[in-house]
């Protein structure tokens, strides 16, 4: 189901970053290598989001989440909870095959395919998709032992995932929210 991508989100000291690879896979065929599966959303682009799973389903979820974010006046926590409530109530949405990561400078959430809202234990690193566990492991190690800035950490972690996961490539795109920029 989620064999099409890797998305990694990192909330560091100076900024929040989301990154994703560009590979779109259908079965055992690579359809595209330069897809964009991350976005800046919300008022002034102060929320970052990325998806893994069915593209059509993910676009529906993006639209729904943006509406929740707008209703919540860019309050990511409230929007995530409201989004989860809507997801669980709607029979059609419960069948969507997609997951999302959303983050701002305060919060980071994984929105699961069944409407769960999960904040990572460390409150700063989350990953989804077929290469998600590889990217997550690399990011945790680089965060703990490395000396990289936030964007470099995300890019290097995704590159490591692309070397292991056949559904992830090294065409990496990132979006950032910086504290002083």
Curated annotation (Swiss-Prot):
- Please name the gene that encodes this protein: hslV
Localization (cell): Cytoplasm
Q: What is this protein called?
A: ATP-dependent protease subunit HslV
Provide this UniProt record's keywords sorted from A to Z.
Allosteric enzyme, Cytoplasm, Hydrolase, Metal-binding, Protease, Sodium, Threonine protease
The positions flagged as active site in the entry are 5
PROSITE patterns recorded = PROTEASOME_BETA_2 (PS51476)
Activity regulation information from UniProt: Allosterically activated by HslU binding.
Concerning HAMAP family, the annotation shows: HslV
EC id: 3.4.25.2
Q: Which reaction does it catalyse?
A: ATP-dependent cleavage of peptide bonds with broad specificity
The record's note on quaternary structure and interaction partners says: A double ring-shaped homohexamer of HslV is capped on each side by a ring-shaped HslU homohexamer. The assembly of the HslU/HslV complex is dependent on binding of ATP.
Q: Which GO terms describe its molecular function?
A: metal ion binding; threonine-type endopeptidase activity
InterPro entries with a match to the protein in the record: ATP-dep_Prtase_HsIV_su, Ntn_hydrolases_N, Proteasome_sua/b, Proteasome_suB-type
Give the UniProt family note. Answer: Belongs to the peptidase T1B family. HslV subfamily.
Q: Which residues form the signal peptide?
A: none
Residue positions annotated to bind Na(+) are: 162, 165, 168
What NCBIfam families would the database entry show?
ATP_dep_HslV, PRK05456.1
Any one of the GO CC terms: proteasome core complex
- Summarize the protein's role: Protease subunit of a proteasome-like degradation complex believed to be a general protein degrading machinery.
What Gene Ontology terms for biological process does this UniProt record contain? proteolysis involved in protein catabolic process
Coarse class of the primary localization is: cytoplasm
